Amino acid sequence: MSSDQEMAVFGEAAPYLRKSEKERIEAQNKPFDAKTSVFVADPKESFVKATVQSREGGKVTAKTEAGATVTVKEDQVFPMNPPKFDKIEDMAMMTHLHEPAVLYNLKERYAAWMIYTYSGLFCVTVNPYKWLPVYNAEVVTAYRGKKRQEAPPHIFSISDNAYQFMLTDRENQSILITGESGAGKTVNTKRVIQYFATIAVTGEKKKEEPTSGKMQGTLEDQIISANPLLEAFGNAKTVRNDNSSRFGKFIRIHFGTTGKLASADIETYLLEKSRVTFQLKAERSYHIFYQIMSNKKPELIEMLLITTNPYDYAYVSQGEITVPSIDDQEELMATDSAIEILGFTSDERVSIYKLTGAVMHYGNLKFKQKQREEQAEPDGTEVADKAAYLQGLNSADLLKALCYPRVKVGNEFVTKGQTVEQVYNAVGALAKAVYDKMFLWMVARINQQLDTKQPRQYFIGVLDIAGFEIFDFNSLEQLCINFTNEKLQQFFNHHMFVLEQEEYKKEGIEWEFIDFGMDLAACIELIEKPMGIFSILEEECMFPKATDMSFKNKLYEQHLGKSNNFQKPKPAKGKAEAHFSLIHYAGTVDYNITGWLDKNKDPLNETVVGLYQKSSVKTLALLFSGPASGEAEGGPKKGGKKKGSSFQTVSALFRENLNKLMTNLRSTHPHFVRCIIPNETKTPGAMEHELVLHQLRCNGVLEGIRICRKGFPSRILYADFKQRYKVLNASAIPEGQFIDSKKASEKLLASIDVDHTQYKFGHTKVFFKAGLLGLLEEMRDEKLAQLITRTQARCRGFLARVEYQKMVERRESIFCIQYNVRAFMNVKHWPWMKLYFKIKPLLKSAETEKEMANMKEEFEKTKEELAKSEAKRKELEEKMVTLTQEKNDLQLQVQSEADALADAEERCDQLIKTKIQLEAKIKEVTERAEDEEEINAELTAKKRKLEDECSELKKDIDDLELTLAKVEKEKHATENKVKNLTEEMAGLDETIAKLTKEKKALQEAHQQTLDDLQAEEDKVNTLTKAKTKLEQQVDDLEGSLEQEKKLRMDLERAKRKLEGDLKLAQESTMDIENDKQQLDEKLKKKEFEMSNLQSKIEDEQALAMQLQKKIKELQARIEELEEEIEAERASRAKAEKQRSDLSRELEEISERLEEAGGATSAQIEMNKKREAEFQKMRRDLEEATLQHEATAAALRKKHADSVAELGEQIDNLQRVKQKLEKEKSEMKMEIDDLASNMETVSKAKGNLEKMCRALEDQLSELKTKEDEQQRLINDLTTQRARLQTESGEFSRQLDEKDALVSQLSRGKQAFTQQIEELKRQLEEEIKAKSALAHALQSARHDCDLLREQYEEEQEGKAELQRAMSKANSEVAQWRTKYETDAIQRTEELEEAKKKLAQRLQDAEEHVEAVNAKCASLEKTKQRLQNEVEDLMIDVERTNAACAALDKKQRNFDKILSEWKQKYEETHAELEASQKESRSLSTELFKIKNAYEESLDQLETLKRENKNLQQEISDLTEQIAEGGKRIHELEKVKKQVEQEKSEIQAALEEAEASLEHEEGKILRIQLELNQVKSEIDRKIAEKDEEIDQLKRNHIRIVESMQSTLDAEIRSRNDAIRLKKKMEGDLNEMEIQLNHANRMAAEALKNYRSTQAILKDTQIHLDDALRGQEDLKEQLAMVERRANLLQAEIEELRATLEQTERSRKIAEQELLDASERVQLLHTQNTSLINTKKKLETDITQIQGEMEDIIQEARNAEEKAKKAITDAAMMAEELKKEQDTSAHLERMKKNLEQTVKDLQHRLDEAEQLALKGGKKQIQKLEARVRELEGEVESEQKRNVEAVKGLRKHERRVKELTYQTEEDRKNILRLQDLVDKLQAKVKSYKRQAEEAEEQSNVNLSKFRKLQHELEEAEERADIAESQVNKLRVKSREVHTKIISEE
């Protein structure tokens, strides 16, 4: 809790945010008795404070604060929290959490004007109904960057937390501000926007300049200004709220990568258009109308031709016209200012006001009815003139279009008459359409202005939707608003209560699921499900003659009495009529459906729309420019009136927008703000208890607090936790060794002094209870403060010691000066001193003259030398400048590449983190989808029961509609038509004839009088529509019946396919995610282990080739063993088939015996023999299966172990190969790449096969050469190590000498400068002279020629041959020039060295400095030598690739041999130079000539290396420029090779898994072989890989689907035949069970295969991406090879480590495959266990048959018991085998499950109680059977054992004694096992049922929508066609008669 000083930053807002220290102290010292202080229930106040006086018999007597004594029940008493919890900021921290505690905490805070309170994870705000100073800039600044626990509750705190989460978690955020109407949502939305607009641009004002001339404000100003404009046109006064938002908006504020404001956009939902023309008494229209009439801007009054009195305009004066809390004049200025700031042009601004004024004038248009006619005509034109002027129209055209609209009939337009009522309705519709389209257009313009085109990274969305509304008159708008709030509340409940708890279970935290009872699915589905309210409304809109009453009747028929949330309202006095009531989460709302059909269809006068499109007001013309623009402006509902296919209702558009909104919200991290209405009277400070409690219950506030307290709301990934909180106790995590993040987090938390029950460890995250994370943050801040303080102290101490040392030195200097001054003062008057002063200058001058003479001579000499050296220096300086420039350019290039590499690595790390986050999101989304499916599952059962009923009712409804239409239009009794279609057609023919006669009569009347023309045409049109509708309905219903059936069958098949695919995809996704997490963890562990094993690499080199051969041998052996296993499996499958045949035959025999009723002893004997044979075969088969599986598992394990061991050894050898055999590995890689590439190209170019063979031959030759080079490299490496050691020693000695030289140089500064100049000149002479420049120019010239030749070789292969030959000749010429130049340079350098030797004799003290230069140059020489080696290898590889691709193998051989020879010569020279350098280095301090020889050798090598380096860099550059295509082919080739290896590994795993399962499912074996063949082809033909896999999978799915369809059909047939014959049912159930078992195993097999393939593909993609990254790094390393050899080594080490990691990952993949195989083995064992149980059941049957045979008196009863037991066992097997398909067969299997449970209960009771509580029908029979069975078993147990000879059954069923363990114990064990299996299968069935229900609901919803769309399209199309035909006939007849 902050102190008053800390709260001072909030300024005047501090008292409204947090209690003062004085109040907190008083609360802590307040007397309190926890036992007697309570809340008690009160009928008036809900709860009151009281003091307990006594407790007796469950009753409590208490005295309230008011002094009243009450007696209540114990459960109506709630303990009170201690006073320190009064006005607590987070109600989750309260000791006692219940409704009265929450209510009074809110009430007390509200009384103190603390309107914001935390409630667990969200914030509760109470509307104060007054202005509070808590939103000023001072408060914004105070909340910026504060953690939630550091500042009082506030909307700014929620906003800042969302902002910080967005920056840290890199995830989009959303703030959902919900509550009932009038709760303060709009105000809080504006505050959120104000906060973001303030903090996101602080300090960046200069950057937010307008991007165009139209913008009048900065981006933050525009975002803030959007609210006043939208409120003016979209907000209005309602009964509960003076500034109610009559539209919903979702404001997205986009931020850049740095968190700065980038742009914004607004999405609006469902503007309440009806308010434009109608308001209730206590309400008023939109604010803009009253702002304009406030006369604040008189020019608007004049421009719009209006008055300042709202009562002059009917549309805006139906309710109130003023609002006390709103100043319309000030609001008008704010609106006008917002229009300017938002960049609207002056024309657009004027158009907005004009269209608004025109809407007001529309309400004053008057029309009257013509005399003796129903035709309407204008009653005056003054108002119409004003409206037309404002809209840029002609008033006469406008009135004519309103009164006489033109309707298109066929291809012609017909003028139609309108009644007065129709005209008024059309005017109102036009006014609403203009206002609505203008509003949407303004929103689009605002979005256009707010889109700054700046880069966006993330956004924060703020949702402000109209709150829940309960008015006296609730229409369609209220239903849409309340439905939206219902969906948002469901989203809140799901996020807070379901996802939160599922996250705990997913992470493995012990948690019991808590059902808070907050599921709102019933009400939501009642509104939006098929045949829901919206669906019925849209269906009614499709029928021309549908009315509000028909809509109400359909609602009642569908839902009244069937849905608890749909009720018939009770009539109330003084209230508007209500037609139905809905029970929402916030209360029951009565809805009036008057006019809903028209509102939903939203018709417009097309003639007036045509005028609008031609308006001179551009904005109006733009609004109605056509359907395309309508959709663009967000209003597609007006655009499609010409074709039925484009017809879209308001409700459909609303649902579409709502679904988009919910999708957006689910993709963000939500933050909830719950707004509360304190009272209905808008009184500040007053709180109505019951009203607040109702909102708290509905909003889930208490449940949210409860789950926050019980659960773990805070969580963080292990890696993030370790990184952030390691500072708390760094010693807990050991340094220098790898430790898993989870273990590190556990150790860290264990070492911290916190309550260990307050956190839990999940699989990927650590979870904290509420408040603990804040405590850790405080501890971290304290620790950081301590560390910083300690660091500052040490820094200050260091600075103080330095200052003290300076002071000591100054003091000593002062003492020295003082001593000398005192001494001088003592001797200055001494006579000898005076003489000394006089003589000393004379002596010094004589010496000076001598010295000057000598110095002049020396100066002359030096001057001459200087002149010579100066000339040389200038020449060398010029060269130095050029070289320095080149060096700087290279350094800049290297630096840029290094920065790019760093950026790439950073991006890679970010992508990895993002990938982890996205995977977590995918899991959450998947779980969320599963939750949604579970929510919908309950209703699916009801829907399934009603499906048949609905289809029948729908047919009846269609027939009734046809009948009603005929009764209304034809006035004939058509009851016979419903019974028979033939009679209906006859009636229609008669009706058509009569209508034709009436039409002729009407046409004759039309010729007689023009006055009756319009009325008669209306009748003709009406009758024609009726006739065509009837004809169309009859024809279409007859024709579409068969199409509908076919369509439903097709959709049913598609549904089944989609359900199977969905389930497989979900399962595979979960498996892949789990496997990925395990593999990632193991990958980290393996990387750490590999780092420790690298030291053993050098000892394992000789074993590489032998191990590879061994691997191949083992693989060949494994393939042989796998073939043997396949043969064994085939035999096993045959045996299994024989077993199933015998089993089926045995069952048939048993059934025949049962049907016969009295089997003979011979038949029983035969049955026993067959069963014994069957049992023996089964036992043999099981033993063989176990043996084969054990053998296969052992072989696989042995193979995996050997492969792992060999792979580990290979990995160990890899580093040595790459480090010590650079040339060998690169050339081998190049040749392998060429060979692989030629294999690929050989399919298209057969002529390259010869080159492949040539390359293979050359490979063997190169390997021998490489072996020799390997030995040479080893020797050179050893020499280099010794030289490096000696160089280090020399460097140390040189450092010491440098220090000595620096001291001597102070005394001889002039001479040292000359020496330094000479040394620099000497170094420059050694580096380069005129010969070097000549050689460089010739080399560049040669390189230019080579570049031109290389470009020409792209034009043709012949030109490439000539270019390569010429380049080789020029290279040879250059080499000869180089050799001659080198000889000349050597002679010149020898002369220079002699001169240097003489100088060195005179200046021997400077030898050490020169020696330092020698050592550094030696290092440079070695570095450049390595670079030369690498670059030479690169050139050789590139030349080899070019030669291979262009069929120039011979030239390649020549070039390769030349480079090889040169390479060997260079190595020989290097070896000689190194030996000579080593010998010279040892004698450096004794022999002076050693320096000359070393320098000579050094310069020779430098010259050669530099020339070679220049040549190679130029060649590399031109080859890189000209060979882009070659490199691309190489990359493709390497990718293919990598994919080949990866896919090969995956293929082996997949084959192992498939072969393991092939023995069980023979029908799937062919499909898996097809998968294998497809994968093999994919390796050879990469381009067809994906298509082949898809086709293969599709074939598998189709085959499996067809199999499943066949089994389902057979299953359904079996169920239908069950009613006819029980014997046939048993046989078909056995077949069905067998088929289902095979299909289920096939599905499991396919899922496992698909999961392995997907996992393999993921690893393949990861490896490819990693390889691409490494290739890019390698390319950069090659470019930086000249100056950054150390970086090359580092990157190569990185490459090696990555390669090892990839191989480790492959090994882990193999391990995972092995685990999968082990799991399959376990599965097999479980299947064997199941078979054993089935065997036991069969044995029980045989035993009971034996008992029946021996018990003659009870033979018939025992036989019946055996029949019952067999039926029970068969149904148990049926339930077990068909559980995977229950989602499609639940309805048919419900009875079967019940029978199974019933019989299982009977068996359990029989075993436990001896038949005491049997069902009435079987009681007597089973009792007798039980007694006989027990008596017979006691006498014959030994005989039964001998006959059956089943030792395994004897051991399992514990038949070891004769009397103690009899039939009861055996049956008990069997029943327990069966019951456990039944329960497990029930759980599986429920899960499958839920999935099935979800899929069925989705399918049926789609099916229903499709049916509706097709029906609407067919109806509209047939109506249009027939109307066209009829109109043509009428037109032709009229013309002919005229």
UniProtKB/Swiss-Prot annotation:
Pfam families: Myosin_head, Myosin_N, Myosin_tail_1. It is found in: Cytoplasm, Myofibril. Residues 1127-1146 have a biased composition (Basic and acidic residues). Muscle myosin is a hexameric protein that consists of 2 heavy chain subunits (MHC), 2 alkali light chain subunits (MLC) and 2 regulatory light chain subunits (MLC-2). Interacts with SLC26A5. The modification Phosphothreonine is found at residues 64, 69, 419, 1240, 1264, 1285, 1466, 1500, 1516, 1729, 1735. This is Myosin-1. The keyword Zinc does not apply. Required for normal hearing. It plays a role in cochlear amplification of auditory stimuli, likely through the positive regulation of prestin (SLC26A5) activity and outer hair cell (OHC) electromotility. Residues 33-82 form the Myosin N-terminal SH3-like domain. The keyword tRNA processing does not apply. The modification N6,N6,N6-trimethyllysine is found at residue 130. The gene is MYH1. Keywords: Actin-binding, ATP-binding, Calmodulin-binding, Coiled coil, Cytoplasm, Hearing, Methylation, Motor protein, Muscle protein, Myosin, Nucleotide-binding, Phosphoprotein, Thick filament. Residues 842-1938 form a coiled coil. SMART domains: IQ (SM00015), MYSc (SM00242). The rodlike tail sequence is highly repetitive, showing cycles of a 28-residue repeat pattern composed of 4 heptapeptides, characteristic for alpha-helical coiled coils. Limited proteolysis of myosin heavy chain produces 1 light meromyosin (LMM) and 1 heavy meromyosin (HMM). HMM can be further cleaved into 2 globular subfragments (S1) and 1 rod-shaped subfragment (S2). Residues 1124-1146, 1152-1171 are annotated as: Disordered. It comes from Bos taurus (Bovine). Residues 784-813 form the IQ domain. Gene3D superfamilies: 1.10.10.820, 1.20.5.340, 1.20.5.370, 1.20.5.4820, 1.20.58.530, 6.10.250.2420, Kinesin motor domain, Myosin S1 fragment, N-terminal.
